[in-house]
Swiss-Prot record:
Species, as recorded: Staphylococcus aureus (strain NCTC 8325 / PS 47)
EC number in record: 6.3.5.2
Group of enzyme by EC: ligase
Protein name (record): GMP synthase [glutamine-hydrolyzing]
Gene Ontology terms: biological process: GMP biosynthetic process
Sorted UniProt keywords: ATP-binding, Glutamine amidotransferase, GMP biosynthesis, Ligase, Nucleotide-binding, Purine biosynthesis
Length: 513
């Protein structure tokens, strides 16, 4: 994930906090590029990246636990501003000679702090509401530091070493519950780190096109095309960079939404004048998935088979060296790092065979979903395509829970088409981040006409979100839900019950598998 040297960068080091991706997002919202990296990154790597500032994230551990995460203390001697958040502040205190101890009880939730007017709190009121989440507490600050905020529960809510530009806060400025959190981060980024905030989709395109051209040269690239937003944006970006050196492979694996295959060929083959090949691999995928019910195994099989299909097509084309994918930053984060447990392996990052014959190109793997949409608009992709519903690489294969069969796929395909049609008719497409139907591996008793039925249950999932990292269930009007339910039960065979998922993320994920 190298950036051009002239690009301003705030480096976020990951200590396992559930909020660490939010830090990255908040910085980017200010027009400054930010990346999340493992805390074990070397000093040489940091120097090579040349960040304007470094943020140490929070984390669930105690700095005194055996094997607790740490950093090379030389980071503090690089002359680069550092901001430690919660665990990051406690670690900074410990490494620089202060004292930290286990608190009698964990402090979690809203708190009031009293802040002094300094660089970090410039222009902000003295009394502020913040969000605390920590089990350790600082009891003595290192030499050269002073207190810049306190609270009823701690004398050290925020500290600074003004000379070395090292800061620490015992709360989470990145979460919405912290009243002036964005302002504090903005002060760090702009006042302390002297960033100008010039990161835009326009200069992202310029940088990526140049990187693609330098890497590819006169060689050829295959793009994994699904018709979804991510792969569409990747295809258009690559086409803009290398033109006819790009061949798009659209694998129709039989796990697509209703009418999706024909739409992809029409929009991209004809509309964008791209070289696109449609491969009918339905039987191939269904044979591989026969008898498989474990979701992780399904994802791996689909990911592997995708690449094998590309291998076959590439051998026909000759001279293809690269495979392009629409991997997002959320895919990379959710697939796990050393500090974070894998939530689920993503098709784009976790299902690739070790004997793959391609070099990977993932030009949007540093972007969140909303940023990809902005990129798509900047590239000239029509809004109705940019705002299409997110669709996972494994397709309906992970929306049929348990073993996949043709009959089950048809239930999901038809019920999903009804859901999307009603949402569109009600004008809710832009209000809801993602919506789809799933088929849980359960049946229930019902009555249709004068007869007892024992048929499938369809689940509706609709969520609101900004970037897909967190979400809440959409508060769809009851009459609209009733309309959707009635149509599904009456128009889709072998369905006698419809349920609505009202779970947020976390604790659940958006997809059911």
């Amino acid at each position: 994930m190298e950036m051009a040297k002239e690009q301003e960068l705030i480096l976020v080091l990951d200590f396992g906090s559930q909020y660490n991706q939010l830090i990255t997002r908040r910085i980017r919202e200010m027009g400054v590029y930010s990346e999340l990296h493992d805390h074990e990154i070397s000093i040489e790597e940091i120097k090579k990246m040349n960040p304007k500032g470094i943020i140490l994230s929070g984390g669930p551990n105690s700095v005194y636990e055996e094997g607790s995460f740490t950093i090379d203390p030389e980071i503090y001697n690089l002359g680069i501003p550092v901001l430690g958040i919660c665990y990051g502040m406690q670690l900074t205190t410990k490494l620089l000679g202060g004292k930290v101890e286990r608190a009698n009880e964990r402090e979690y939730g809203k708190a009031i702090i009293n802040a002094k007017s300094d660089e970090l709190f410039a222009g902000l009121p003295a009394e502020q509401t913040v969000w605390m989440s920590h089990s350790d507490k600082v009891i003595e600050i290192p030499e050269g530091f002073e207190v810049i905020a306190d609270s009823p529960s701690t004398d050290y809510a925020a500290i600074e070493d003004k000379k070395r530009r090292i800061y620490g806060v015992q709360f989470h400025p990145e979460v919405r519950h912290t009243e002036y959190g964005n302002d504090l981060l903005n002060n760090f980024v702009r006042r302390v780190c002297d960033c100008r905030g010039q990161w835009t989709m326009e200069n992202f395109i310029e940088i990526e096109i140049e990187k693609i051209r330098q890497r590819v040269g006169d060689r050829r690239v295959l793009c994994a095309m699904s018709g979804g937003v991510d792969s569409s944006v990747v295809a258009v970006l690559l086409h803009k960079a290398i033109g006819d050196q790009l061949t798009c492979i659209f694998v129709d694996h039989g796990l697509l939404r209703k009418g999706e295959g024909d739409m992809v060929m029409e929009q991209f083959g004809e509309g964008f004048n791209m070289n696109i090949i449609r491969v009918n691999a339905k039987d191939r995928f269904m044979n591989k998935l026969k008898g498989v019910s474990d979701p992780e195994q399904k994802r791996k099989i689909i990911g592997n088979e995708f690449v094998y299909v590309f291998d076959d097509e590439a051998s026909k084309l000759k001279g293809v060296d690269f495979l392009a994918q629409g991997t997002l930053y959320t895919d990379v984060i959710e697939s796990g790092t050393k500090t974070a447990q894998t939530i689920k392996s993503h098709h784009n990052v976790g299902g690739l065979p070790e004997d793959m014959e391609f070099e990977l190109i993932e030009p949007i793997n540093t972007l969140f979903k909303d940023e990809v949409r902005k990129l798509g608009i900047e590239l000239g992709i029509p809004e109705h395509l940019v705002w299409r519903q997110p669709f996972p690489g494994p397709g309906l294969g992970i929306r049929v829970l348990g073993e996949i069969t043709e009959d089950k796929l048809e239930i999901v395909r038809e019920s999903d088409a009804i859901l999307r049609q009603v949402i569109r008719e009600e004008g809710l497409e832009r209000e809801i981040w993602q919506y789809f139907t799933v088929l849980p591996n359960i049946q229930s008793v019902g009555v249709m006409g004068d007869y007892r039925t024992y048929d499938h249950t369809v689940g509706i999932r609709a969520v609101t979100s900004i970037d897909g990292m967190t979400s809440d269930f959409a508060r769809i009007d009851w009459e609209v839900l009733q309309k959707i339910s009635s149509r599904i039960v009456n128009e889709v065979d072998h369905v006698n019950r419809v349920v609505y998922d009202i779970t947020s993320k976390p604790p659940s994920t958006i997809e059911w598998e």
